[in-house]
């Protein structure tokens, strides 16, 4: 009887822990990882730009109104359009058409609307007069008067949920088995989210006063140049995404070594009509629990981010300085995601799904309460540690908020995202496609828009309110939502065990 040598045993254990991908699987693993890298690369450039433009050009308070009254209706419309498209078009064509639409809109804003914003927007003095005359409606007036910024922000907000959460993961879930997912998904997260570090360094340079762009072109307005150069990069990377989708569709879906499902199973979801498919989804307790989890994250993180971003604007008031700080934050978020992905990979293998999935809501709740505590009890804390804190209260709030967001996003984009995607794998094709579209696109926006709705109601009723003044209320709501998220994770774990 042959015995396994100690060196071979150690090699197998090392591979299982750090590189559980077989050599013959690299033909599938590398293209999917590259696609995730490119989609997240664009996603994080857009994240930096949308916040820097909207908050610096208008205010932090307007973001909540934009999410409620602009982003959510567009997201709902997209789900309806997508359900129609999937019945008539291949995934490949859907990806091409949506990419062309979004990139065209971003180019139009960067090269036509933004440089000539005074032509397209209501004059600031006129807008200010209207807002002063109707104080309870001033934020709604600002939405309409600054429509260019709002449209750009809305489309940039939709990019992650359409291209990453929906299209990429639907594509990937179709290609991978449950057994492969346990080995691949955390590594996808590791390689894909490393793009945040590259984006951080890139955007820090593009937004700084000593940007490398000055060596090649003359800069008349640094903020417009920042947006135009960034948009050009986004367009190039989007083309690479389309080429990767083409390669995967042509060479991986047709290779029985990489793709193990029958063509008939892939087309099952396309035979049901729109109304019938949505009725099917509504009856699924499983999807409702998934919706609560996704919505809870969007709701909770948006409450913290809203207050934090208002503080950032006070410290960094211009588009470029805001973008430079945001780039540093994105960079460290990338580092946190990579570290937590390595941790999460081992947690998921060594423990059950619930242990891995519950890490995100617990960390977000603990760090969020600490941040709100600093904002609500700032004077008491500063007097208690008088002389020990070497930075201003504003700089301290921005720093603590940054740490909170880095830890929250780090756990969410590494551990929670991969845990959530495993929940879709055992589902049938209808729930896996149209059900995923409804949950992933709508739920995240419902979460953020519900949070924005709470904020918009307060700001409408109390026109002079600020995020600092309403922080005690937001803190209570935030804590309640985090507990609801933890409860939903526990319930869906029991449902997952029944079908996995």
Swiss-Prot record:
GO terms for biological process: nucleobase-containing compound transport. Disulfide bonds: none annotated. It is found in: Cell membrane. Coiled coil: none annotated. The chain crosses the membrane at residues 26-46, 62-82, 94-114, 149-169, 184-204, 224-244, 287-307, 328-348, 357-377, 381-401, 469-489. GO terms for molecular function: ATP binding; ATP:ADP antiporter activity. InterPro entries: ADP_ATP_car_bac_type. It is a multi-pass membrane protein. GO terms for cellular component: plasma membrane. The keyword GTP-binding does not apply. Keywords: ATP-binding, Cell membrane, Membrane, Nucleotide-binding, Transmembrane, Transmembrane helix, Transport. Belongs to the ADP/ATP translocase tlc family. NCBIfam families: AAA (TIGR00769). Provides the rickettsial cell with host ATP in exchange for rickettsial ADP. This is an obligate exchange system. This energy acquiring activity is an important component of rickettsial parasitism. This is ADP,ATP carrier protein 5. The lineage of its organism: Bacteria, Pseudomonadati, Pseudomonadota, Alphaproteobacteria, Rickettsiales.
């Amino acid at each position: 009887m042959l015995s396994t040598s100690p060196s071979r045993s150690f090699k197998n254990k090392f591979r299982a822990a750090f590189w559980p991908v077989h050599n013959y699987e690299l033909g599938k693993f590398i293209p999917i990882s590259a696609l995730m890298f490119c989609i997240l690369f664009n996603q994080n450039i857009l994240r930096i730009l949308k916040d820097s433009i909207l908050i610096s050009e208008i205010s932090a308070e307007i973001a909540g109104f934009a999410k409620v009254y602009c982003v959510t209706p567009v997201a709902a419309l997209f789900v309806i359009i997508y359900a129609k498209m999937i019945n008539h078009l291949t995934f490949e064509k859907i990806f091409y058409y949506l990419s062309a639409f979004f990139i065209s809109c971003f180019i139009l804003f960067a090269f036509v609307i933004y440089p000539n914003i005074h032509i397209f927007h209501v004059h600031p003095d006129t807008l200010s007069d209207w807002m002063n005359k109707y104080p309870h409606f001033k934020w709604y007036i600002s939405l309409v008067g600054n429509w260019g910024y709002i449209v750009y922000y809305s489309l940039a907000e939709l990019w992650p949920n359409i291209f990453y959460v929906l299209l990429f993961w639907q594509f990937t879930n179709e290609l991978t088995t449950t057994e492969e997912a346990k080995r691949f998904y955390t590594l996808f997260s590791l390689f894909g989210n490393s793009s945040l570090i590259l984006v951080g360094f890139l955007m820090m340079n593009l937004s700084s006063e000593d940007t490398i762009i000055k060596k090649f072109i003359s800069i008349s307005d640094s903020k417009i140049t920042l947006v135009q150069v960034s948009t050009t990069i986004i367009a190039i990377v989007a083309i690479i995404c389309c080429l990767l989708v083409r390669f995967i569709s042509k060479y991986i879906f047709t290779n029985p070594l990489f793709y193990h499902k029958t063509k008939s199973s892939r087309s099952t979801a396309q035979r049901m009509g729109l109304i019938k498919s949505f009725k099917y989804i509504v009856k699924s307790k499983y999807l409702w629990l998934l919706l609560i989890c996704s919505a809870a994250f969007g709701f909770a993180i948006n409450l913290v981010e809203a207050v934090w971003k208002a503080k950032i604007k006070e410290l960094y008031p211009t588009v470029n300085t805001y973008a430079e700080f945001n780039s540093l934050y994105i960079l460290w978020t990338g580092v946190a995601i990579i570290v937590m992905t390595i941790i999460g990979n081992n947690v998921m293998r060594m423990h059950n799904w619930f242990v891995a999935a519950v890490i995100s809501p617990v960390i977000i709740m603990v760090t969020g309460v600490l941040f709100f505590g600093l904002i609500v009890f700032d004077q008491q804390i500063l007097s208690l540690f008088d002389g020990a804190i070497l930075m201003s209260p504003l700089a301290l709030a921005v720093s603590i908020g940054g740490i909170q967001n880095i830890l929250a996003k780090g756990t969410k984009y590494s551990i929670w995202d991969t845990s959530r995607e495993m929940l879709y794998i055992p589902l049938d094709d209808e729930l896996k496609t149209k059900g995923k579209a409804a949950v992933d696109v709508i739920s995240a926006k419902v979460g953020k828009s519900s949070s924005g709705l709470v904020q918009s109601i307060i700001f409408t009723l109390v026109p002079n309110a600020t995020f600092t003044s309403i922080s005690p209320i937001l803190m209570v709501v935030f804590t309640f939502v985090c507990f609801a998220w933890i409860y939903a994770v526990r319930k869906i774990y029991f449902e997952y065990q029944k079908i996995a």
